[in-house]
Structure formats: C-alpha cells, structure tokens
Swiss-Prot record:
Native organism: Aspergillus oryzae (strain ATCC 42149 / RIB 40) (Yellow koji mold)
Cellular localisation: Cell membrane
Cytoplasmic topological segments: 76-122, 342-406, 631-722
Designated gene of the protein: prm1
Main function: Involved in cell fusion during mating by stabilizing the plasma membrane fusion event.
Coiled-coil region list: none
Protein name according to UniProt: Plasma membrane fusion protein prm1
Family note: Belongs to the PRM1 family.
Keywords noted in UniProt: Cell membrane, Conjugation, Glycoprotein, Membrane, Transmembrane, Transmembrane helix
Gene Ontology biological-process entries: plasma membrane fusion involved in cytogamy
Membrane topology reported for the UniProt record: Multi-pass membrane protein
C-alpha cells in the first residue's frame, strides 16, 4: 500500500535525530545520551512533572468541587437554620395559642355546661313534679280502690247477713204475734163462756150469801185475756239488727284521713321543689377559667441548634475527610504515575530502536512510542485476530476511542461523576441526621399536647368538682325530699293499714265476722300495700342523680390525635396545608436538602451526558471499524489504489523505510536547517529486523515534497484516508 498522496508532505520535515552530529558514523543517526542535553524531556524532567499528571489534577478538581459544594451546603444549612428558628418561633407561637385554647374554649364550654345543667335540672323538676303528682294520685287511687273494694265486699256480706237475720226475725215475730192473738181470742171466748156461767153460778150464791151478810166475788179475767191478745215479740229484736245494719262503716273517715295524710307529703315535696329549684340558675362563676399558656421550648430546648451544629460538624468532618483523602490520593497517585513514567521512558527507549531500523510505518511507530498504553492495549486486542486487516482495524478502533480528546472527555465525565458521588455521600450523611430533628420537633408537639392535657385535666377536675357539688345539692335539696316522701308514704301506708285494722276491730271485734274480714283485708289490700312499700323502698334507695363528668382530654384530644393517631402527615396541627413533611421545621431542612439533591442530580446528569458523548464517539469509531471489518479492499479496477511494487524478503515481509534516511555525508557537512522539505522522489528501502512489538505489516512509504503544504497527520492506507 502507498501511505501518501501526490502533492502532500509531512511538515516540518525534521532530519533524523543525530544527523547533525558530525561525530556520528556515516549512514546512521547517532542519538545523544539521555542524561545529556537533549531537545526532549529526559527521565528526570518527566519525573519532575509527575505531580502535574491528569489524575492528580482531576482529583484536585474533584476536591475543589466537593469543597465548593460543602461550602454551599454549609451556607444553605445556615439559611435553613435561620428559617428553622423562625419556623420554631412560629410553632412556639402557635403552640402557645393551642395551649391557651382552654382559656378561650372554657368560657363557651362553661356556658354550654351550665346551660346543659340548667336544662337537666328544669327537666328533672318537671319530671319530679309530674312523677310526684302521678304517684300521689296513683297511691290515693290504689288505696281508695282497695278499701272501697273491701268496703263493698264486707258491706255486702254484713248487709246480706243482717237482712237475712231481720227477715227471719220479722217472719217469726209476725207468726208469733198472729198465733198469740188467735190463742188469746180463743182463750178469751172460752173464758167468757166460763166466766158467764161462773158469774151466773156466783150470782145465785151471792143471793144466798147476802142473807148471811156476805158477797161472793165474781170472776173477771177479760183484762188478762185482752193482755194475752195484745202479746207480741219485743221490738228490741229488730232494733238490735237495725243497729248492726246501720253500724256498717262507710270508711268516709278513713277516706278523708288517708287522703289528707297521703297528700300532705306530696304537696310538701312539691312546695319544696318549687321553692328551692323553681327558678334554678347554675352559678357560672363557679366554673373555672384556665389561664393563658406561654410555651418557650425554642429557648429552653437546643434541639434545633444541636441538629444544625451536628450538621455543621458533619460537613466540616466530611470536608476534612475529603480534603485528606483526596490530597493523599492525589499525592499517592504520583507514585504509580512516576512508575508509569519510568516504564514509559524505558518503553520509549526500547521502541525508539524501531525508528532507527527504518523498517516500519513511521506514523504507527510515532503512535506506538507516544501512546504506549493505548497502543499496547490495541496490539493486545488485535492479537486475537489472524487477519492483518482486522488487526489494524481493532487497533484503529481502540486508538479512536482513546485519543487525547476522547480521553479528556472520558476523564472529565468520570471526574464529574466522582465529584457527584462525594457530594451524594455528604448529602446522605446529613440526611441521616434529619430523623433527630424530626424527633425534636415531635417533642415540641408532645410539649404542646402535654401542656394542653395538663390544662384540660386541671380545668376538667375543677369543673367536675363543681358538677359534683351541684349533684350533691340536688340530691340533698330535691331528691332528699323524695326520700323523705317515700318514707312518709310508707309510714302513711302503715298508718292506713293500722287505721283500717282498728276500724274493723272496733266494728267486728269479738264477732264471728272479724277473722274472715281480716283474711279478706290481707288478701285484697295487705299484699298490695306491701308491694307498694317495696317499690317505694327501691325509689328511696335509688333516688339520686349523678351528672356526667367532663373528660380530662376534652380540650386536648384533637391535638393528641393529630400527632399520635393520624395516618396523614398533613393532619398534624403543626403542618401547613400542602406540607409534605410532618411539620414546618423539618420542611425547611428538607427543602434545602432537596435543593442540594437537585443540584447533585443536575451535575450527575451533565457528567452522564459528557460520558455519553464519549460513548457516542466510541460507537462512531466502532461502527466504522465494523463496517470495514466485514468489508474487503477494492481492486484497481474498482477504484482501489495502485499495486505496490516491492519485493518481499524471504520471510514474506516488505521493509518500509522511514520518512528520513540518514545522510551518509552528514559527517562532513554542517547540521541541516529545519525547513520545508523539497520535492524528492520516493525513497524505498528494504530492511528487516526483529523487534518486540512485531511488524507493522506490509508497508510502502512515499513522500512527495511540496514546499507550501503541511503533511496530514492522518494514517493513510493506500490512497484512502481512514
């Protein structure tokens, strides 16, 4: 292949090193000693610039970026601290207002409590009056039903018995009266006949007796007969029965007595209730009003200052760590770079022999010598292929991807990503301290809730004391009379039973009716009265009221629920609508951290884009190499280059001379001037010597001199520029 086109030259055309040395042997360039004065940098000069290697500079740039980021982060944290202090003051003010809410709410709650108690008492009074009236009427009705039923019952029995007795006596009297009168009349008639005969007999005797101066009395029993005719049973028999009949009690006295006795306690209770609670008004001044609260947790608690002090210490520590680590790394990287420079120097010395042998592609030799690592990597990768064309393409692709410009872009991208990684580590170190701030803020909320709970509990206890006093007053002044009235009713019922029993005893005592009437009374009235007394005893035992107490957390339950039981962070009473964090203080810190995070993210994206540019460049070279990799060279008839006319050696290699051939007359001539090369015919030489890096392949170098053109730095294979 031909490696140049007609009319082009390499500018400037430098003579081989040593061609100006008059002491050099004829036909060869004599190099200077490396430790002497040379136009290029020797080993010591190269080692003196080890600290200027790219890795040290990149690490220092990364260090500078990290320090700038740490400084900016510290400035942002200072701003966040000021905002957090302001937010804490706002929270403190709001917390004080929240803690003082019992002071403002208690007035309304007290009014509500008083109104509720008044309504309850008024309802209780109405209920009691209605209940007392109903119980009074019910008891009186019940007692009247009982004794009137009993009155009707034994009136029926007694009157029926007396009526039957009176009927029997009346029939007996009529019979006796009629019989006695008839007997009297019959006896009267017989006596009259006998008396008439006797009187006639006696009249004769009287005539005789008159002669003797005497008179026989006549018999006259008509008067007695008349008395016999008029005989009848005495009316006292009917009078006794009428007395029994008329003596049946009507219980009017019992009715009046029981009614008066029963009504008295009920009416007294009504009067007392109306007198004591008729116009009941709850004493609102007795209910407590809590004092205002002033919270000072921002001044008393150093949680925020502690958090930001820890953040500042973390940033300073990270700055020191990065400073120490990166400086040490930048210093230590000089060691392998120095070792690399030594190896590079030795490699350059070894590979400089290729130049002296005048047997290889000069551009390839220059590339191998100037870029030993990338060239070595390309040669190593190309060794996997047996085809020389593919070996060349592999080396070209690697050289394309590792050109100075490409490596600059790659190193810039990696340095940017490494700087982003350092900033990310610093950011994560700060984020790990955020839960401490959240915990501190949670304690702020707990302090507010605790203050609310204490104030609410104290107010509730005082209010409950007032309510208990009112309940005791009602139980004593109102329901105490209920207890008294139930006792009085029980006593009245006992008096009713005793009075009724006394009436029955006075009326039927000693008679055969007393025992049955007593049994009937116990059955009809006694058992019912006992049941009523049992019910009144139950009322007496349970006649009291207990107004419900005010809960201790009535004024703090909402705030406590927003802190402990809320599933949404925005439900916290410390949060503003739309806050994504649990409170305003951590929202300030998170906003700063998110800002820093966005900056790191932006830098990462930029570095990734720079890395993508290098990757795209690598893909361009790889795609072109792959296209040529699977292609073939064109023949001359297809537009390819002219055939190479040279004779290979016995090993099949064609020696390719370098650009400049040592001047055999140089020993007797002065050193040449550095000028544009003159147009000279191509010089072809055939040399072959073994060297470490192998052969550059079959080459033919042609240099056409042109005084006004600069030679291209592209490697040319044939007449096609790659």
């Amino acid at each position: 292949m031909v490696f140049s086109r007609s009319g082009r030259s390499i500018f400037p055309l430098l003579p081989p090193y040593g061609a100006h040395d008059p002491n050099g042997g004829p036909g060869r360039a004599v190099p200077l000693h490396p430790d002497g004065i040379t136009p290029y940098l020797g080993l010591r000069a190269r080692l003196s610039q080890v600290w200027l290697n790219r890795w040290t500079i990149l690490l220092l740039l990364v260090l500078a970026r990290v320090l700038i980021a740490a400084t900016g982060m510290q400035s942002d944290m200072d701003s966040a601290k000021r905002e957090a202090q302001s937010a804490c003051t706002s929270v403190e003010t709001m917390g004080s207002a929240m803690a003082s809410m019992p002071h403002y709410l208690s007035r309304g709650v007290n009014e509500l409590t008083a109104s509720g108690v008044e309504a309850a008492v008024n309802g209780l009074i109405s209920m009691l009056l209605l209940t007392i009236t109903g119980v009074e009427a019910l008891i009186i009705f019940f007692i009247k039903v009982m004794y009137q039923t009993y009155l009707c019952l034994f009136t029926m029995v007694v009157r029926g018995s007396t009526q039957a007795a009176l009927g029997v006596i009346q029939d007996t009297t009529e019979f006796l009266n009629k019989t006695v009168q008839t007997v009297g009349e019959d006896i009267g008639k017989a006596v009259e006949t006998f008396e008439s005969g006797l009187n006639k007999f006696l009249s004769g005797i009287n005539k005789v007796a008159s002669a003797f101066g005497g008179e026989v009395p006549t018999l006259n029993i008509s008067k007695n007969i008349d008395e016999l005719k008029d005989i009848h049973l005495p009316g006292s028999i009917n009078d006794t029965i009428d007395k029994i009949n008329s003596s049946i009690p009507t219980f009017d006295e019992v009715d009046k007595f029981v009614t008066d006795v029963l009504k008295f306690p009920f009416e007294e209770v009504k009067s007392l209730i109306n007198g004591s609670l008729g116009n009941y008004t709850f004493d609102r001044s007795a209910l407590p009003v809590p004092a205002k609260e002033q919270l000072t947790f921002c001044d008393e608690n150093n949680g925020i200052n502690t958090f930001f002090r820890k953040v500042a210490e973390t940033i300073v520590a990270a700055r020191k760590i990065f400073l120490a680590v990166l400086i040490i790394a930048a210093t230590l990287v000089c060691v392998p770079v120095a070792w690399q420079e030594i190896r590079r120097w030795r490699t350059m010395k070894e590979r400089s022999q290729i130049v002296r042998k005048d047997a290889h592609d000069p551009m390839d030799v220059v590339y191998i010598v100037s870029r030993p690592h990338t060239a070595g990597a390309g040669i190593k990768a190309a060794s996997r292929f047996s085809n020389s064309r593919r070996q060349i393409l592999v080396r070209w692709a690697i050289a394309y991807a590792t050109s100075p410009a490409a490596l600059f872009v790659l190193c810039l991208a990696l340095a940017g990503l490494f700087a982003c990684l350092c900033q990310y580590l610093l950011l994560k170190a700060i984020e790990r301290t955020v839960p401490e701030l959240t915990s501190e803020v949670g304690e702020f909320a707990e302090k507010v809730v605790t203050s609310l709970q204490n104030t609410s509990a104290k107010w509730a206890n005082d209010t409950n004391g007032v309510i208990d006093g009112m309940s005791n007053d009602i139980n004593k002044n109102v329901l105490g009379w209920v207890n008294t009235s139930t006792t009085a009713v029980n006593d009245t019922l006992n008096a009713f039973v005793d009075k009724t029993t006394g009436v029955l005893n006075d009326t039927f005592g000693g008679t055969i009716l007393y025992s049955p009437l007593q049994d009937v009374f116990n059955c009809l009235i006694g058992l019912k009265v006992a049941s009523v007394q049992k019910g009144l005893t139950w009322v007496h035992d349970h006649a009291h009221v207990d107004f419900p107490h005010v809960p201790n957390d009535i004024l703090s339950k909402g705030a406590d629920s927003s802190i402990n039981n809320s599933t949404s962070a925005s439900d916290s009473f410390l949060a503003n609508p739309g806050d994504k964090t649990s409170d305003k203080i951590t929202e300030v810190v998170m906003r700063v951290l998110n800002k820093i995070k966005e900056g790191v993210r932006t830098e990462t994206i930029i570095s990734a884009c720079v890395l993508g540019i290098w990757f795209i460049n690598f893909l361009f070279g790889l795609i072109r190499a792959m296209i040529l990799f699977w292609g073939r060279d064109k023949n001359r008839g297809e537009g390819g280059g002219a055939p190479i006319n040279n004779n290979p050696d016995v090993n099949g290699f064609t020696e390719v001379p370098l650009t400049a051939i040592p001047n055999t007359q140089a020993a007797s001539l002065p050193a040449p001037r550095y000028e544009v090369a003159l147009k000279t015919p191509p010089v072809v030489g055939h040399f072959h010597e073994d060297e470490k890096m192998g052969y550059a392949g079959q080459r033919a170098l042609k240099v056409d001199g042109t005084s006004d053109l600069r030679g291209s730095s592209y490697i040319e294979y044939g007449i096609e520029k790659r």
